[in-house]
Amino acid sequence: MHSSVYFVALVILGAAVCAAQPRGRILGGQEAAAHARPYMASVQVNGTHVCGGTLLDEQWVLSAAHCMDGVTDDDSVQVLLGAHSLSAPEPYKRWYDVQSVVPHPGSRPDSLEDDLILFKLSQNASLGPHVRPLPLQYEDKEVEPGTLCDVAGWGVVTHAGRRPDVLHQLRVSIMNRTTCNLRTYHDGVVTINMMCAESNRRDTCRGDSGSPLVCGDAVEGVVTWGSRVCGNGKKPGVYTRVSSYRMWIENITNGNMTS
């Protein structure tokens, strides 16, 4: 489904970046109440969960661009909505084929910037109490440091790499970007288009990439990268700020696929 072709040198460089700044890293959280987060999506490749996502409306899901690294036209990409458990039968869960995959034009495997992707479902999602969109934060203002925000996903929940079958959630505290960029943390690589959250033994982990960071009633960020070791307090979790990409998201979801 992901048709972009990268030069070999770019792929090698991208691998080096990811080794230093691993992608998608819920550790230290707890199981979410079933269907309490009806906006959550599971992005799946060939039937396997790879990333989280946010349902924006009946046809569009927002996630992280790096989730499609290595995915080809021969792979099957689907989005699961209405799920708490990835495997157990549930009355409201349904898989949707993906009609279009639209990565941000600035996203590249050798870069941490512009790490967003939009999936257009092949048919409208059936909305209700268990499947419901969540609004994005479009006001371009910083979230105050110390603000408590929620993140959820089906990613790794232990250092041993155990992946849960049910949705887990975590509350994190927003960190000042200047602090996050200190040499002892991320050493200047966090840009104005990113935001940080404290990660001391409580963090997103592998498989949580693309999941929304929810502050109040809006999506403020998308899980993108962090530490090689999830929950490392010296490597805060980093999220892509959605307000920085308002125009791109609106253009694509309103039908301007060339944006």
Swiss-Prot record:
CFD is activated by the removal of 5 residues at the N-terminus, named activation peptide, by the MASP-3 isoform of MASP1. N-glycosylated. Belongs to the peptidase S1 family. The record marks R25, I26 as: Cleavage. It is an enzyme of class 3 (hydrolase). Residues 1-20 form the signal peptide. It holds the Pfam family Trypsin. GO terms for molecular function: serine-type endopeptidase activity. Serine protease that initiates the alternative pathway of the complement system, a cascade of proteins that leads to phagocytosis and breakdown of pathogens and signaling that strengthens the adaptive immune system. In contrast to other complement pathways (classical, lectin and GZMK) that are directly activated by pathogens or antigen-antibody complexes, the alternative complement pathway is initiated by the spontaneous hydrolysis of complement C3. GO terms for cellular component: extracellular space. The active site is at H66, D115, S209. Glycans are attached at N46, N124, N176, N251, N256. Circulates in plasma in a mature but self-inhibited form. Activated by factor B (CFB), which displaces the self-inhibition loop. Associates with CFB complexed with complement C3b. It is found in: Secreted. Its EC number is 3.4.21.46. Residues 224-228 are annotated as: Self-inhibitor loop. This is Complement factor D. Residues 21-25 form a propeptide. The self-inhibition loop inihibits the serine protease activity in absence of factor B (CFB) substrate. It comes from Mus musculus.
